[in-house]
C-alpha cells in the first residue's frame, strides 16, 4: 500500500510517534497518542469524539492511545477514551466504541463491532464479523 498523504487530517494536539504511516482520507482527532511503528491504513478515524461533542461547546476529547507496532486497517473507526496495547491489529471496517481497553497483541477481525465499555487482556483474538455488546464481560 502506498501512503500518499492525501486528505490526512491530524489534530494539533495529537502525538504521533516515530515511523508512523497514515493512509489517505484518515482523521486523527484531539488527544490521540500514536506510539512508534504504527500503520493506519486509508479511510480511518482515530479518536472519534463522543456524543457530547455535538451538544457541549466546552467538550474536550478524552485521550486515545494506540500502542507501538500496531496496524489499523482501512475503514476502521476507533472512538475516543480507548486504549490499545502494543501489537494491536484490526481487520478492515472495524468499529470500536468509547471506553474500550485492549491489552498487548490483540487482534480484531474484519467487520467486527465492539460497542464499548469493555476490557480485554493480552493476546485476545476476535475473528471476523464479531459483535461485542456494551459492557460485556
Question: Where in this protein do the model-derived segments appear?
Answer:
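Basic/polar N-terminal segments that are highly enriched at the extreme N-terminus
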Residues: 1-2
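Intrinsically disordered, low-complexity Ser/Thr- and acidic-rich flexible linkers and loops
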Residues: 51-61
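Left-handed beta-helix
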Residues: 5-6, 11-12, 17-18, 23-24, ...
Amino acid at each position: 500500500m502506498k501512503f500518499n498523504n492525501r486528505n490526512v487530517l491530524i489534530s494539533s494536539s495529537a502525538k504521533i510517534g516515530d515511523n508512523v504511516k497514515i493512509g489517505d482520507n484518515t482523521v486523527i482527532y484531539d488527544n490521540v497518542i500514536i506510539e512508534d511503528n504504527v500503520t493506519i491504513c486509508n479511510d480511518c478515524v482515530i479518536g472519534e469524539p463522543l456524543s457530547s461533542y455535538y451538544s457541549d461547546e466546552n467538550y474536550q476529547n478524552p485521550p486515545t492511545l494506540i500502542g507501538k507496532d500496531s496496524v489499523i486497517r482501512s475503514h476502521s473507526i476507533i472512538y475516543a477514551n480507548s486504549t490499545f496495547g502494543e501489537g494491536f491489529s484490526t481487520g478492515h471496517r472495524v468499529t470500536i466504541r468509547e471506553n474500550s481497553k485492549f491489552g498487548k497483541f490483540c487482534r480484531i477481525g474484519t467487520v467486527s463491532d465492539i460497542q464499548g465499555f469493555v476490557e480485554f487482556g493480552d493476546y485476545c483474538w476476535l475473528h471476523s464479523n464479531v459483535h461485542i455488546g456494551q459492557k460485556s464481560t
